[in-house]
Regions:
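Short intrinsically disordered, low-complexity coil segments enriched in acidic
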Residues: 1-5, 264-265, 424
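Serine residues within intrinsically disordered or low-complexity segments
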Residues: 2, 16, 32, 36-38, ...
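N-terminal chloroplast transit peptides
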Residues: 6-8, 12-14, 22-43
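Short amphipathic alpha-helical segment within the helicase RecA-like ATPase core
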Residues: 60-368, 372-375
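A generic structural signal for tightly packed, nonpolar segments enriched in small/aliphatic residues
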Residues: 300-630
Length: 630
């Protein structure tokens, strides 16, 4: 879909028991397109005009024969189907149908928090907490408590106590909040059914841990589900999404000196926790959605819906959106994105580049930041196709784009005029394509001309993510955006998991200060990162080509593959990012940061999205605004 084509959105019905609730469909926004006069991106090949059937057209043509799957059409509707609330008091969550108390042992046993819990429950919380030794992974125990109700009846309360590891039990590279343990244990709890509530009382040693724990809670209660309901046999129940009950979260600061409600986390800390949790759930849902539903058109629509949501809020500086589809990408010289998305485009799933921009109060006088996300909606490996064991799960290859979009929405929500980040502009660039197999697929030995002007010989069609990112960072660092800081986020290499594992993203940067700030942001947010070598003199040579400026895959797969992949992306930055000093108006040198989230973007075992990267980027933007990264 391109130009002024509108997004078709169907009205949604969500089934809860035998009740059907109609959810209003959001207003469709047209896709804007901007083209520039540049050479055709693929070397030695002219662009071919293709007629195609859009997703909307296909659905209209088949509606009469195939029942529509009545899934929510917007993030707000998905969130409404499985509500997560931050802000209730401890007393409020203690009155829910089930209760989980979470925190380090000393905080859980804090009498100021326990004073808000019914006395009979309080005794069980103490007993369970005292009996547990959390070690370095935390611990959980569950019991049932007989509660006397105000009408003289009795009921059973399912009580769970989760004790997080003390900071002293965790290594220096881990997050002192122990948020990894919170996510692990809370994920074992059942999401409440419609009409029921689950209360989560979080006892924190400090309000600064609120975001990390909130992100962990968001991971434990994701929104996407295609599981059928009890009404699946009815016409409207077939394919419907069940409405879950509400998870209500109270955050209590055990370090507060005053007693009672004075310990409740409020203000900026609470707002940050809620906004980041929303961003994490958005990113996780995008990753979890099947590729037939989350195709390039759908991912573009997610970005435009986020833009519309932000613009609908009062006090938010305008957010602009520019969308380039295949014809505009060809005209603009985005050869990497066009090449990767060529086969899917023939079937109507055109590649795209989406640019969201939130102008800060100081504009060009302050540092601007561009978040660039890899959005491969499905990766078959291309003509060098993945095997039967390697292709399942490749719907998650858009995790970088999902994380940057979730972080952008959270950052703008928390910083309506950009003051928190120093008043500079914030950009989000999504590089979207499906790496499909077909007659139009790019081939080994093809040469692509990327946005940077560099030519790339293809020696691995399954190393496609770096090609779309190359165009993204060239766009972000070039004259159109001219960002001071460029951060690219991607599920880029399986080698990342070999280098830094499933809990740590691997990062590469040309700035030691930026690298250090990212590591610190990871420990604060719970989205852990670890530096990998930045050495262009060693790694650029891996991409040598006899016929082009470079190849897209390394010669030596044992030579720091993840660093090499990052270096490939860096080679497409504007020239003033190559270690030059000065920057705009005497500011620090322009900087680049590469974040490979291949491992932590999904949960091992379930394969579900984690929303990793949202909390990290929001904290990194906060640190950048306060100049804590210099």
């Amino acid at each position: 879909m391109s130009g002024d084509a509108a997004i078709e959105i169907v009205r949604v019905f969500v089934v809860s028991g035998t009740e059907e609730v109609a959810m209003a469909a959001p207003t469709a926004r047209p896709l804007s397109a901007v083209a520039s006069a540049s050479p055709v991106p693929r070397v030695g090949r002219s662009a071919m005009a293709r007629s195609r059937t859009t997703t909307a057209t296909r659905s209209r043509a088949t509606d009469s024969a195939t029942p529509a799957v009545t899934t929510p059409a917007s993030d707000a509707e998905w969130a409404a189907s499985s509500p997560l609330e931050f802000g209730p008091s401890v007393a409020d969550v203690a009155s829910c149908d089930a209760l989980a108390v979470v925190g380090k042992k000393a905080c859980v046993l804090d009498e100021r928090m326990l004073a808000h819990v019914p006395e009979v429950v309080r005794a069980h919380v103490r007993a369970l907490a005292e009996a547990m030794t959390p070690g370095d992974g935390g611990a959980k125990r569950t019991t049932s408590v007989l509660i006397s109700n105000s009408d003289a009846s009795e009921s059973l309360l399912e009580l769970t106590v989760v004790i997080l590891p003390d900071a002293s039990a965790l290594s220096r590279h881990n997050a002192p909040s122990g948020s990894h343990a919170a996510a692990k244990w809370l994920a074992q709890l059942k999401t409440p059914k419609s009409g029921k509530t689950l209360g989560v009382a979080c006892a924190l040693p400090d309000a600064s841990e609120a975001v990390a724990i909130a992100a962990a809670i968001a991971r434990a209660f994701p929104t996407y589900s295609a599981k059928s309901t009890a009404c699946r046999h009815t016409e409207r129940g077939r394919g419907a999404v069940a409405v879950n009950g509400t998870v209500r979260v109270a955050l209590f600061d055990a370090s507060a000196s005053a007693a009672g409600d004075a310990g409740a986390v409020t203000g900026d800390a609470l707002a940050s926790a809620a906004a980041v949790a929303d961003g994490v759930r958005l990113a996780a849902r995008i990753v979890d959605t099947p590729p037939a539903s989350m195709d390039p058109d759908a991912l573009v629509a997610e970005a435009l819906n986020a833009c519309a949501e932000l613009n609908a809020r009062s006090g938010v500086s305008p957010v602009t959106a520019t969308t380039l589809r295949e014809a505009e990408l060809i005209a603009g010289g985005f050869g990497g994105i066009v090449g990767v998305g060529a086969a899917a485009a023939r079937d109507g799933r055109e590649p795209a580049l989406v640019h969201l921009c939130h102008r800060g109060a100081r504009g060009a006088a302050a540092r601007s930041v561009a978040l660039v996300g890899k959005g491969i909606t499905f990766d078959t490996g291309g003509l060098q196709i993945k095997g039967k064991g390697g292709m399942p799960g490749m719907k998650t290859d858009l995790g970088g784009a999902a994380a940057t979009l979730g972080a952008f929405r959270a950052a703008v929500t928390l910083d309506p005029d950009g003051a928190r980040r120093g008043g500079g502009d914030l950009h989000c660039v999504l590089c979207i394509a499906e790496n499909a197999v077909g007659a139009s697929a790019f081939r080994p030995d093809d040469v692509l001309l990327c946005k940077s002007g560099r030519s790339v010989e293809i020696n691995n069609t399954d190393a496609e993510g770096r090609l779309v990112l190359a165009d993204g960072v060239a766009f972000a660092s070039g004259e159109t955006i001219d960002a001071d800081d460029v951060v690219d986020v991607a599920t880029l290499t399986g080698a990342q998991m070999v280098a830094t594992g499933r809990h740590f993203a691997g990062i590469v940067s040309d700035s030691e200060a930026f690298e250090t700030a990212c590591v610190r942001a990871g420990r604060i947010s719970g989205d852990l990162t670890h530096p990998l070598p930045y050495a262009p003199e060693f790694f650029s040579k891996e991409f040598g080509s006899a016929v082009a400026d470079m190849r897209n895959s390394v010669k030596d797969r044992s030579n720091a593959q993840t660093s090499c992949a990052g270096q490939f992306v860096a080679n497409h930055l504007a020239p003033d990012f190559s270690g030059a000093s000065g920057g705009r108006d005497g500011a620090a040198a322009k900087r680049w940061l590469h974040v490979d989230i291949a491992g932590p973007a999904t949960e091992k075992g379930s394969g579900r999205g984690t929303g990793f990267g949202v909390a990290l980027l929001v904290e990194l933007l906060r640190a950048t605004g306060r100049r804590e990264d210099e």
